[in-house]
Amino acid sequence: ASGQLHRPQPQEHTSTSAAAGTWRLTQASESRHRLPHCSAAPSHQDHSAMGFGPELWCPKGHTELLRLQDSELRLLELMKKWMSQRAKSDREYAGMLHHMFSQLEKQEGLGHLRATDHSSQIGESWWVLASQTETLSQTLRRHAEELAAGPLAKLSILIRDKQQLRKVFSEQWQQLSQEYAWTTQQEVEKLKAQYRSLVRDSTQAKRKYQEASKDKEREKAKEKYVRSLSKLYALHNQYVLAVQAAALHHHHHYQRALPTLHESLYSLQQEMVLVLKEILGEYCSITSLVQEDVLAIHQKVAHAVEMIDPATEYSSFVQCHRYDSEVPPAVTFDESLLEEAENLEPGELQLNELTIESVQHSLTSIEEELLASRKAVSSKEQRVWELQVELRGEELALSPGERVHLLGKRQGLREAQQQLQGLVCAQAKLQAQRDMLANKLAELGSEEPPPALPLQEDRQSARSTDQERSGVTALKTIKNHISGIFSPRFSLPPPVPLIPEVQKPLCQQAWYHGAIPRSEVQELLKYSGDFLVRESQGKQEYVLSVLWDGQPRHFIIQAADNLYRLEDDGLPTIPLLIDHLLQSQRPITRKSGIVLTRAVLKDKWVLNHEDVLLGERIGRGNFGEVFSGRLRADNTPVAVKSCRETLPPELKAKFLQEARILKQCNHPNIVRLIGVCTQKQPIYIVMELVQGGDFLSFLRSKGPRLKMKKLIKMMENAAAGMEYLESKHCIHRDLAARNCLVTEKNTLKISDFGMSRQEEDGVYASTGGMKQIPVKWTAPEALNYGWYSSESDVWSFGILLWEAFSLGAVPYANLSNQQTREAIEQGVRLEPPEQCPEDVYRLMQRCWEYDPHRRPSFGAVHQDLIAIRKRHR
């Protein structure tokens, strides 16, 4: 507890967790945990042909497959522990028998054991009994050695390969899902959004061109119109190619990639079942004795091993998890994009004088990529063939009971086949895009590309332009009328009355966001014309923020003589001013030309200051004071964090960072966000009130009276909360006892997310200084390079464990921050606290591995703590 240090010595690590599991789902468990089937399959299905097919392609099925493998791994660990104990018992028993014979030999001498004056049946019987006991001890010792060198060693290999299989399967499934989502959803949606924007720009440019009266203005408008069409056509082609690629990726994903992945997993799982059967058979053979009573037990064990059939091992699992999951529809061209566009056909490339060059360049580029893709496919096919030949040759030379040594090679073959499927998919997409481009150019032949559009000649009269526009309008009207006949009619709710909404005060307007940071405004405004009203954090003024031409613009609403204005005449209230700008569609200012189109509404977390009744001050944070309080609506007890009004805007934005993280969290071991008050100063973050206070004070005051099992349970709570954050790619960066809260029932909750960050790849690179970093809780890679990740949080969790079992002592108490960093770099770690269980301290040491990749995940830490708690009765 004094925070002294020691250098870790090399030691043999042994597994600290072993839990019973089962591979085969019993009928009773099916009745308790029956899940919906993926499809209506016949009940008398041929189980031998069943695999991890379409029933398990959905995320639920993937989760169940991972859970199945985890269950099997737990069972294998249990078997390994069992066999190890059996070998140890046999060695000890053989040693005891040998000791008995040695003692007898010392007392009587080997000659006296048999030599008698006459032939004595008793002496001969005694010699046989004693000598056969020694023979039995040698046999048992040999059996123990064979058990350790045979089944036990092979079981370790099987566990290692099964862990690797689970890891590879999970990674490949995630990779396939991410690639599928990127190709069929994200990229297509991004192009669709750009498509709509360019269609609007093109329509606007066309209108200006048609309305231009002077020659100079008309020529200028014409150039702008042509440029907009050029961009639109180029993007149209890009979108067509993306849709083609997405459709092919969809087909390949559900017809090739997923079936190959699941067939590979199913095959390897079956192979591992067969390997385990051989291992158990060898175990049964080695441990078999000849006594009748033992033989009866052995026959039962042998029968149980014989019942293992790899072909039907997973039949009950597949039957139990047949989810109702349909393959999503293939990606097709969104014809709604063409409602306002001209001369464009769905799914057809646009080849004209504006796009001929880009189409030719695209064809050249894709042909180069296709050539490289073909080489990669050919190389991978050769590698798959070589692995198959090697595997067949080794199978022929394989001795009975040695299949386990081929598991790694089988898994390598399956991985290569899966990689081949990915390369084939990429080649198919490139080939389809290349064919589409080549066919389009072949249709053109040696002719000149057609003009991009029939531009009106400058000499045409305005009257003819009006006639053409009216003709187009009439044609669109006819189209809309015809499509309306066949499209379903939807009943729409009546429009919301505008007058009562306008008369509401500013704080009740859905588009008023209060004192939110300027940086957050940029995230909320997504499309041109989006707007909101906020309160300036520095000057106590109201600001109208609008997105225009891809940039957020901010206009201070001027207040004078009880009127609010931006440029023209004022109105009595800001809601009336905003409503006037929306209804009239007049520019905000003549210079900017900005027009409001869509209000951005505040989210569900926004509370008014009047909704919260403040109580007494219960603490102080980095940004301001913390109060107890109640919600006026239902008297819910809450904790209210306030932000000092004098702080600069960048610190106020950091204050709200905690709320942005907590909005996405919903877990019993994470403190719950209730809302945010940003309508005026000071800003509040409203959270659930955790009555027990911070964990550090709890340890120092109540820790000595706390039972060991309860303390482990509280650490289990912390690990569960951090495991949830890890799944959300959230990095806490300040995990310590002082930042955890304890409920009245001694449940621990993770709190204080002021330094937290959320990154898609789970890694955050800090570029700030070291002033506020808690050095003694922070991982070395974060201190040295600013690299924060869930692995660095695991290091901090190890310090939290040490704090808990030292009952609130200060880590590295006798060292400064700099001395602590130097000691850690030299391999020095904290000594185990008094009364700390050995398996808990081993877990701490694993958390303090210098290499982040060697530290356990929070999921593993959580499971280890559960196992440790179960062992401490």
Curated annotation (Swiss-Prot):
Residues of the active site: D734
EC category: transferase
Residues covered by the Protein kinase domain: 612-865
Reactions the enzyme catalyzes: L-tyrosyl-[protein] + ATP = O-phospho-L-tyrosyl-[protein] + ADP + H(+)
Gene3D superfamilies: Arfaptin homology (AH) domain/BAR domain (1.20.1270.60), HR1 repeat (1.10.287.160), Phosphorylase Kinase, domain 1 (3.30.200.20), SH2 domain (3.30.505.10), Transferase(Phosphotransferase) domain 1 (1.10.510.10)
Protein origin, superkingdom: Viruses
Domain F-BAR: 50-313
Feature: compositional bias, Basic and acidic residues: 456-469
Residues covered by the SH2 domain: 511-600
Biased composition (Polar residues): 11-29
Coiled coil residues, start to end: none
EC number: 2.7.10.2
Residues annotated as binding ATP: I618, G619, R620, G621, N622, F623, G624, E625, V626, K641
Similarity comment: family membership: Belongs to the protein kinase superfamily. Tyr protein kinase family. Fes/fps subfamily.
Miscellaneous comment as given in the Swiss-Prot or TrEMBL entry: This protein is synthesized as a Gag-Fps polyprotein.
Protein name, UniProt field: Tyrosine-protein kinase transforming protein Fps
Designated gene of the protein: V-FPS
